[in-house]
């Protein structure tokens, strides 16, 4: 009987410990052990750019998803849980009846669907509005999903994107599809193994994009990246290191050889 009581007491202690570990912060919606409130902006950051994040249902349940960092940091952002973009998503996203702003969507370039870099787009946009003191705000559409799902989402959204006159843009850093991605231990900003070299999280992609197109872009990018770095720092304590794939190691070795030859 005494042994049974002792077992019950141990079980209750375990349940209390588990409950304590599962306690969620009311502000950032993350477990208390990895709360990010100390790095989140005290006030949501305003942007001229209207940001729409099409959030794949599977990705929204992933514990390492970075879209919540954006919705907790930016004022002018809308998260839409869906597998494809619909007309109503962009017609009512801003909540106004004003004409739709110039629209861009962030996705890597491909031979069949080329994209302009965000820096090139910024130069073209400034050139087109050089006689206007206050250029119209932009609308940025981002697809948050795994690489496979994101490609499916973009393809399923092509009609609406085309009707909106959306321009496909990519980050200045190119994606190398011939190389497997790295891990959290290869970068301060990567949370999990990416499919290709050059891939980044949604939060970093949006931060880099806003850094290029917003008037106060550098400061906005710095704030968002600091939040992401802290999230990665926390998560790295609980993630098991993964060895880079052979293709990635081979690519790094090839890149190092020219540098070593130059030094000789």
Swiss-Prot record:
The observed outcome of changing residue 144 to A is: Loss of activity
KW Metal-binding (keyword) present:
yes
Q: Which Pfam families match?
A: DTW
GO MF, any single term: tRNA-uridine aminocarboxypropyltransferase activity
Keyword annotations for this protein?
Metal-binding, S-adenosyl-L-methionine, Transferase, tRNA processing, Zinc
Q: Which GO terms describe its biological process?
A: tRNA processing
Query: What reaction does this enzyme carry out catalytically?
Result: a uridine in tRNA + S-adenosyl-L-methionine = a 3-[(3S)-3-amino-3-carboxypropyl]uridine in tRNA + S-methyl-5'-thioadenosine + H(+)
Q: Report motif location: DXTW.
A: 144-147
Question: What residues bind Zn(2+), as annotated?
Answer: 25, 28, 35, 37
Q: What class of enzyme is it?
A: transferase
Q: What is the protein's known function?
A: Catalyzes the formation of 3-(3-amino-3-carboxypropyl)uridine (acp3U) at position 20a in the D-loop of several cytoplasmic tRNAs (acp3U(20a)).
Q: Which family does it belong to?
A: Belongs to the TDD superfamily. DTWD2 family.
What is this protein identified as?
tRNA-uridine aminocarboxypropyltransferase A
